[in-house]
């Protein structure tokens, strides 16, 4: 393989060699200085990224439970795509938290913590009940998260700001889907 890793193989600059129709994949962190800005508290930044990452991770798992269980195929596909968006958000946020805190990797944070160490909002972890309840939960969750991440687009941390800018686009779709 002419690339050092799979991630390198799927970036835009390598589209012409691998994909018939392009990947549509843009790295939201390409060219961004990952150093924590002077005057910013590393512990607070790591904790915030961890909390937002946990919210997205847990909600993505809950939404994935609807695969083969939603009332219509279109809803299954929509919820699966939203779950994948949230999983992508979780990966970036957990990676940033791990990088800033020096506490391992995104996988360490996602898989090697005890249940009580997760810092997600309770809304994200509620068990699946019925489809109507899930759509209301998604509407509340995505509206709340969209409001927070819209403000974080102006974060002094350039990495968090870039992640938020990407996530705002996705969350707008999530909210609009849930609003019907």
Roles of regions detected by a PLM:
Residues 30-50, 112-138, 155:
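Acidic/His metal-coordination segments adjacent to aromatic residues that form catalytic metal sites
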Residues 52-55, 82, 138, 167:
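Amphipathic alpha-helix face/heptad-repeat signature
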Residues 55-63, 89, 93, 141-148, ...:
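Amphipathic, well-ordered alpha-helical segments in soluble domains
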Residues 5-6, 36-50, 58-71, 75-77:
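Basic, Lys/Arg-rich alpha-helical nucleic-acid-recognition elements, primarily the DNA-binding modules
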Residues 1-41:
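Extreme N-terminal leader/anchor segments
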Residues 123-177:
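Internal, conserved structured core segments that host functional sites
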Residues 3-13, 83-113, 178-179:
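Conserved alpha-helical segments that form or flank metal/cofactor-binding pockets of metalloenzymes
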Residues 59-81, 144-160:
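Helix-loop segments that flank and shape redox-cofactor active sites
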